Every structure is written in C-alpha cells, then in structure tokens.
Amino acid sequence: MANSPQCLLVGSLEPYSGKSGIILGLARLLQQQGMAIAYGKPIGTAMNKAAAALEEADIEFISQSLELAPAQVRKPLVFLDEKTITRRLQGQDQTNYAEALEASIQGLTADLVLLEGPGNLWEGSLFGLSFSELAAKINAAVLLVGRYHSPLVVDGLLKARQTLGDSLKGVVINDIPLEALPETKDLVKPFLESHGIAVLGLLAEDRLLRSVSVRELAHQLNAKVLCSEEHLDLMVESLTIGAMNVNSALEYFRQGENKAVVTGGDRTDLQLAALETSTSCLILTGHAGPQPLIISRAQDLEIPILSVDQDTLTTVEIVDQAFGNVRLQEPVKVQCIQQLIATHFDLQAFQEIMAKG
C-alpha cells in the first residue's frame, strides 16, 4: 500500500487466546523505545448489541491504556451480528470491507499499526475479512498467538504456516502450565523453528490473567450486592461450591485461594466457614437472605456478598462461562501482561524480523 505505515496483524487459532494482552504488552514495549503506535480491530466478533458494546469498551480500554489519540484508533468496520450476516447472505450488503480497511489504514500516521484479528483464521470470510485476506490486502506482517492445551498446539501453527506463508513472522504460545514449560522449551519450540516458525515468546499460565473481578461476576449474574460494594474490584481466581457439612467444608475451602463460594442463602454455617478462608466473594442462591452476623463478618473482612435469583447449577454455569471468556479490563491485569511480555517476549528477534520486511 502506498503511503501506508507498517502493519502487524495479531491473530489466534481460537478465541480468548490472549491477543489483546499480547498487543498491550508489545505496544507498551515499542512505545518505550520511542515508536508511535496505532491500534485497530477490523472485525467485531460480537453477535448482539450487548456483546458489541462490551467489545467496543474493550477497544476503548486498550486505547486508553496505550494513551492513544482517537485519530490513532480504528474501530470495527463490521460486526458479526445476525442482522448484518443476513443482509450479507441476501446480497443487500455489497460493501468491499477489505478496501475500506485499506483506506482507513492509509489515514494513519504511525511507525507501526497493531491490528487485532478475529477469533480464528477463517472468521470474517463472509465479508472478505478472514485473517489471510486481511494480511494480504494490507500487506501485513503476522504474529499468531497459540493457546497451549497440549504439545499438539503445533498442529494449528503448522497449518497456519501453510496458509499464511511468509507473512507469518512469528508466534507466541500462551497459557502454558508450569509443568509443561520444560517440554515446550526443549521440544515444541525447536520443532516449530525447524519448520520455519519463529517462536518469539513462551508465556506461562497466570492465575491473575484468567481471573474475573467480583464486579464482572455481579454483572454476569445480574446479582444484588448485599455488602462491601466498594470491594467489587477484588479478583476471583477459582470457584467453589458449598454444599457439604461444615466439618468437610472448612478443609475444602482452605484448598482454594481468592475464590468465589456459591452456596445457599440459608447455609449460615458454610458462609461463616468460607469467610474464614481466602474468599473474594460469597454468591448466595435461593431466596433466603444471609443472617445479620454474616453481613457483619463480611463487612469486617471486606468481602462482597452477592445474592442471585438463579439456582446453584445455573449460577455455576454462568460463572464458569465468565472464566472461559475473560476480558482484559482491570489495570492489575494490564500490569501483569506487560511484565510478562517484557520478560518473556524476544523483542530483539521481533524487531530484526520486522526490519527484514
């Protein structure tokens, strides 16, 4: 593209692999070296208005975290909601989104434009905005994030190399369990590099980055906050269900740290036991409210209590979903990912690769 800045397209093999975090961490490193950064997300993957609002809030959060002026940010050209998809399928929408993206990039003044790709390599194909189409249209270098599930993460990365060719400049393997780090360093990394794939970062799993704020859980559950509302920014790293006798419960509760405990509103014994361990919030189901002594103790310990209308099973399903779809919205997470990238991302190798074009 004539008169266009260099572009780095950051993608993933699956949603919620950590693209936003990688972008935040890498962008901050580059800014510290004096580079002017711009950021964009060409395609919004939200399926409804509520999800679209959250996605736009995430874009705004990244922009603010990087202190980018509005002129240095490009919001989605299209969202994958049902109405938009139907219009495209019916032929009512004939927009050439790839050309629209190219035009929007040409209006940016930056040393590097970081673009966040869709959830996988094929999403957006209906609109001409699949990952490979994006990379080709704007002549972008590609950085892929692979979330570790097993050593077979190499399968997806090898296939991506076949699809993307020389535009794939490197990969970051994210969320690696500590026990799998040696194998990933000694076997997976050399194997990928022997197949022409530069491994620029190996990031161990971090409980904080996979945690959810009490505030977010309250939002997802449509919960009523009964006390300690000023402490909704506490982070929840795990979920525990309290449905046993109190003697078993105390030992069980001690096994989890920074946890949310889901239990019945009438189980005063379990509520007290949970409050005496590392608990970030109580989530009470059913229609029975907690006793005054529970409210008082929770206030003393600065632990929020949430009351929900759902039954225990539904509540647990919603919380589990929240853990699976973690958003990067808390400053403490930004600090964490920036430290991880600063420590474990090979910036020198990245810059050398980018300089070669």
UniProtKB/Swiss-Prot annotation:
Gene3D superfamilies, A to Z: HprK N-terminal domain-like, P-loop containing nucleotide triphosphate hydrolases
InterPro entries per UniProt: DRTGG, DTB_synth_BioD, P-loop_NTPase, Ser_kin/Pase_Hpr-like_N_sf
Record GO terms (molecular function): ATP binding; dethiobiotin synthase activity; magnesium ion binding
A Pfam family annotated for this UniProt entry: AAA_26
Cystine residue pairs: none
GO cellular component, one term: cytosol
Any GO BP annotation: biotin biosynthetic process
Family per record: To A.fulgidus AF1212.
Protein name: Uncharacterized protein slr0039
Organism of derivation: Synechocystis sp. (strain ATCC 27184 / PCC 6803 / Kazusa)
